[in-house]
């Protein structure tokens, strides 16, 4: 569907995943959550989705994600929000079964045609990964928000956790960074059409194909890059035995991102993410804010053996996925994340 400027971002305080609460603050209030033997996923490291075993051969994968508008077109907002929510299941190496819509609708500023187009965009993305939208729930809200509750399935022994990287692995990122910067420029009405088109293409792309390709190479860990930024999600992938060495010169950014960054068009979420990550890399400064930029529908982080990394990269590139090797897993260092 053609992009329409329906002024969705004008009526919200923060756009997309930049509206998330600070990761540091959340960590202090979620320590009451309990685990049972059937819950296979780890609740202590902000896993992308829950994995709950219901039989010897089947586990349910469940996640929920909703965001405020990051673009001004209702159809594209719905598609992006859906891609963002579905990504958590793909990051677990699982298959999506169905999804439920979650809608907070601002009836004061939007008519029901906005809602119709939004739901159509989401439905098209869910169909793209051979799944179904089976219902949902809508409330009136002072700000528009939309997302999905997604259910998937996986064999209990075959899901991919986010904190099981092995020393020597390479880390592949499957999408360029910078959607937080570009969406901030859009909200400020300073984003040009070329960069808007680039941002839309990036965020609407599902991580479905990338996940399917990665699984052929038996990755040791996977996650996706969303609201906590590249460094925040790498932090969640750490374990007691490893650190990450990031190759700064290899980091991919969407066209125009550095230009808008230098103009000071930086989302508040980037500063929150920087504070969250400083305990691991104390010498981190505001020059590295780009690495903390909150992403919406960002790429996968795939931890894969060095011997398989180049072949995996080629398979991704053959599917027009803009993947890059951006880091290596090393023995535990004084700083858990090293930028070289």
From Swiss-Prot:
Keyword terms of this UniProt record: ATP-binding, Kinase, Magnesium, Metal-binding, Nucleotide-binding, Selenium, Selenocysteine, Transferase
Gene Ontology molecular function: any one: magnesium ion binding
GO cellular component: cytoplasm
Chemical reaction(s) catalysed: hydrogenselenide + ATP + H2O = selenophosphate + AMP + phosphate + 2 H(+)
Biological process annotations from GO: selenocysteine biosynthetic process
Keyword Heme among UniProt keywords: no
Cofactor binding mode and count: Binds 1 Mg(2+) ion per monomer.
Disulphide bridges, residue numbers: none
Domain of life: Bacteria
Enzyme Commission code(s) on record: 2.7.9.3
Stored Pfam families: AIRS, AIRS_C
Described purpose of this protein according to its UniProt entry: Synthesizes selenophosphate from selenide and ATP.
Complexes and interactors: Homodimer.
Annotated protein name in UniProt: Selenide, water dikinase
Organism: Campylobacter jejuni subsp. jejuni serotype O:2 (strain ATCC 700819 / NCTC 11168)
Name of the gene: selD
